[in-house]
Amino acid sequence: MSSRSPKDLIKSKWGSRPSSSKSDTALEKFKGEIAAFKTSLDEITSGKGKMAEKGRSRLLEKIQVLEAEREKNVYYLLEKDKEIQRLKDHLRSRYSSSSLFEQLEEKTKECEKKQQLLESLSKETDVLKNQLSATTKRLSELESKASTLHLSQSMPANCFNSSMNSIHEKEMQLKDALEKNQQWLVYDQQREAYVKGLLAKIFELEKRTETAAASLTQQMKKIESEGYLQVEKQKYDHLLENAKKDLEVERQAVTQLRLELDEFRRKYEEARKEVEDLNQLLSSQRKADIQHLEEDKQKTERIQKLREESSIFKGKLEEERKRSEELLSQVRILYDSLLKHQEEQARVALLEQQMQACTLDFENEKLDRQNMQHQLYVILKELRKAKSQITQLESLKQLHGFTITEQPFPLQREPESRVKATSPKSPSAALNDSLVECPKCSVQYPATEHRDLLVHVEYCMK
């Protein structure tokens, strides 16, 4: 038997078992990371997520941490390989049993599995690096597109950038959650492998104790008579008791590890459910963001269409305004011409009234002239009669001239009285007694001055 106990060998080979305080701190840390992930996702859904640069820096930090852990695990595995090789050499020198070599082979296989897990972890880090480079390239392309789009349409570009930033942030959060999930899976597998190895070693130790006890009983039967072997028997009994105690301790450790494994499995299931919920939420948020982007695109197209229609309507409105101005000018011209026409009509009506008055005056003057002509005709007729009477009187005077010379003076008066009796008034006196009036101003002229009356009538009619 080795001077070192099986517990010390297990601890030296697999490292000390994590205490309950460390598991509690890891659990609290995991809960805090889940709460931070939830708050960051809530901030993303509410439009308050961080920028894409912060997400990239965070992913780089995660990758650096994973690389550091990978290097640490590589160093740890190298140390474990050295320890395993040392144990192989020690066991080869101490024991020649094939079962121990088989156990060591199993341990080496487990180490190879851990190495494969480490390689898979490194591959995952490389994949994450490639994804990071692809996402950075895509983000640069989207930023260039967004900058070109921002020159034409600022508001849709801002919405697009914010939505892309939120989508990128959600992708980063999801990648972080997947990385943590993968780490927990690796840790769970390692713990399960450790528990299986520990159980196998405990089973092997039980077999070894049984075989050692059987061999000891046989040896004790063979060398009961020998007294110097009593000390060895006590020594082996003491070692057997110690091995049983260590076995009991390891059994308790196994039960504790099983409980912790069940607890971590439960936590892993909860975390997996939360990750699934977050994936569903992220997918729904992506659909909503895509729908918002489509709606923003439709809104921008509609705004552009409305702008074009408004420009067309503005052109038509300008044309209608020019036409209305032209029509107003034409209406003003027509109104002015209408006013002039009305004035001309008023003047024409006034002239017509004046013409009617003139025609009426002319008719009146014509009637007056006809009356005057009739009066002149009557006067001329009377003048002719007066002239004929004068000629008759002169002829009678000449005829009676002789008788007047022969008779005395009284006889001469008798014919005059007779003449006066025969012609009570002379023609000149009759003409002087007749008066003629102007038809317009009613000025009276004697019949003897009829020529002056004609001149006055012509002057008065002008």
UniProtKB/Swiss-Prot annotation:
Q: What is the lineage of its organism?
A: Eukaryota, Metazoa, Chordata, Craniata, Vertebrata
- Entry's localization field: Cytoplasm; Cytoplasm, Cytoskeleton, Microtubule organizing center, Centrosome, Centriole; Cytoplasm, Cytoskeleton, Microtubule organizing center, Centrosome; Cleavage furrow
Q: What is this protein called?
A: Centrosomal protein of 55 kDa
Q: How does it assemble?
A: Homodimer. Interacts (phosphorylated on Ser-423 and Ser-426) with PLK1; the interaction is indirect via the MTMR3:MTMR4 heterooligomer, occurs during early mitosis, regulates the phosphorylation of CEP55 by PLK1 and its recruitment to the midbody where it can mediate cell abscission. Interacts with AKAP9/CG-NAP; the interaction occurs in interphase and is lost upon mitotic entry. Interacts with PCNT/Kendrin; the interaction occurs in interphase and is lost upon mitotic entry.
Is Manganese among this UniProt entry's keywords?
no
Positions of the region Interaction with PDCD6IP? Answer: 160-214
PTM note says: There is a hierachy of phosphorylation, where both Ser-423 and Ser-426 are phosphorylated at the onset of mitosis, prior to Ser-434. Phosphorylation at Ser-423 and Ser-426 is required for dissociation from the centrosome at the G2/M boundary. Phosphorylation at the 3 sites, Ser-423, Ser-426 and Ser-434, is required for protein function at the final stages of cell division to complete cytokinesis successfully.
Where does the record place the region Interaction with TSG101?
Answer: 157-235
InterPro entries associated with the record:
CEP55, EABR
- Identify the GO cellular component terms for this protein: centriole; centrosome; cleavage furrow; cytoplasm; Flemming body; intercellular bridge; midbody
